[in-house]
Amino acid sequence: MAHMRDLKRRIRSVQSTQHITRAMKMVAAAKLRKAQAQVTAARPYAAKLEEVVGRLMAAVDPETQPLAATREVKKAGYVLITADRGLAGGYNANLIRLTEERLREEGRPAALVAVGRKGRDFFRRRPVEIVKSFTDIGDNPELIQARELARQLVTMYLEGTLDEVNLIYTRFYSAIRQVPMVERLLPIATPREKKDTGDYIYEPSPEAVLRVLLPRYCEIKVYRALLEAKASEHGARMTAMDNATKNAAEMIDKFTLSFNRARQAAITNEIVEIVAGADALK
């Protein structure tokens, strides 16, 4: 009987957990739909802006632009974008692992800009310099947040605190596929091949346009990374909670089968005892 009571307690416990994971899956699915729509809307704008910047950069000497001029990299910076919360499968762990690999391969001083509690809390316990940290981005990143982050990154780059800035985030492909990646932000990459700019007349000069456009370009690149990361987080959490719900169902079936077998054995033992008692009275 004690074994049966223990099985019933386990079944109730797993059922309670299953209700929670199912609810979290539904919440994550709702948030994912909105985040996915934001990513889909932002990608064409970011791609067109990158095309415009590339065409302008091809028309000027990159060394005249402070955000594109190359210099010796004495200290590299990595902007790690993780989540503020867990229960998202391997989402945070994969980003942290990629960051550790890059820091090991760097072979020169490096610093971290941590966006999200999970990455910040992990590297606080490691011998890694965290120059800035940003948390509470929310489920729907806003452009004003990206603008502030980009402004501080540009300032650190121009002041020489960082000689190179890279974004580490997860690119969103689908609810079941998100890929961690490293993407350079600063200095802004210049086209390898000169593009034909004969069809364009710039007023004012390309140099003047770029001085205004490049900071904006950094803002949009950071904003897109935040959107991609948030959609990936929701997708990873939805998948993780779906798997947890399925695993809970399997555990409930397993415990229920064990409970039924134990109950059947108990009933059989009672019948045997009754028959044995009846035989003894004859």
Curated annotation (Swiss-Prot):
Subunit structure: F-type ATPases have 2 components, CF(1) - the catalytic core - and CF(0) - the membrane proton channel. CF(1) has five subunits: alpha(3), beta(3), gamma(1), delta(1), epsilon(1). CF(0) has three main subunits: a, b and c. In this bacterium the a and b subunits are transcribed but do not seem to be translated, thus the ATP synthase consists of the alpha, beta, gamma, delta, epsilon and c subunits.
Family in the record: Belongs to the ATPase gamma chain family.
Gene3D superfamilies reported in the protein's UniProt record: 3.40.1380.10, ATP synthase, gamma subunit, helix hairpin domain
Protein name as annotated: ATP synthase gamma chain
An example Gene Ontology CC term for this record: plasma membrane
Function, in words: Produces ATP from ADP in the presence of a proton gradient across the membrane. The gamma chain is believed to be important in regulating ATPase activity and the flow of protons through the CF(0) complex.
Keyword annotations: ATP synthesis, Cell membrane, CF(1), Hydrogen ion transport, Ion transport, Membrane, Transport
Superkingdom classification of source: Bacteria
Disulfide feature: none
Molecular functions (GO terms): ATP binding; proton-transporting ATP synthase activity, rotational mechanism
Cited InterPro entries: ATP_synth_F1_ATPase_gsu, ATP_synth_F1_gsu, ATP_synth_F1_gsu_CS
Source organism of this protein record: Moorella thermoacetica (strain ATCC 39073 / JCM 9320)
SUPFAM superfamilies, sorted: ATP synthase (F1-ATPase), gamma subunit
HAMAP family in UniProt: ATP_synth_gamma_bact
Bilayer topology term: Peripheral membrane protein
Pfam family, one: ATP-synt
Places the protein is found: Cell membrane
